[in-house]
Amino acid sequence: MNDPISDMLTRIRNSQMRGKSTVETPASKARARVLDVLADEGYIRGYEAKTGKDGHPAFEISLKYYEGTPVIRELKRVSKPGRRVYMSVGDIPQVRQGLGVSIVSTSKGVMSDANARSQNVGGEVLCTIF
């Protein structure tokens, strides 16, 4: 697997389209940081570390729905292994006029676009969520 973040986002997107309540993904520090931002912004209920079916560490992600429809309507990977996207603090895009969130990997850690602006740091734009 070349892009673990993209794999996790695809698992979340596919599970929500199928109406699943939870989804399992292999564990890593980078995935945990992205999941922390998703939980803080209210796009997932939370996640917990456990041992996967194959015996390796995994995260069980609890997906969030509002009146039967998924809270996450759109989930896009921006920076990819073949084309990294770095932006200064002034260039970080607002998703849907501020209704969505960009997840940015900065020198101060992985955070939402609003936190990056408030701390005046830019970085690699990992994905956008609406």
Curated annotation (Swiss-Prot):
Gene3D superfamilies: 3.30.1370.30, 3.30.1490.10. InterPro entries: Ribosomal_uS8, Ribosomal_uS8_CS, Ribosomal_uS8_sf. SUPFAM superfamilies: Ribosomal protein S8. GO terms for molecular function: rRNA binding; structural constituent of ribosome. GO terms for biological process: translation. Keywords: Ribonucleoprotein, Ribosomal protein, RNA-binding, rRNA-binding. One of its GO terms (cellular component) is ribosome. Belongs to the universal ribosomal protein uS8 family. Part of the 30S ribosomal subunit. Contacts proteins S5 and S12. One of the primary rRNA binding proteins, it binds directly to 16S rRNA central domain where it helps coordinate assembly of the platform of the 30S subunit. This is Small ribosomal subunit protein uS8. It comes from Jannaschia sp. (strain CCS1).
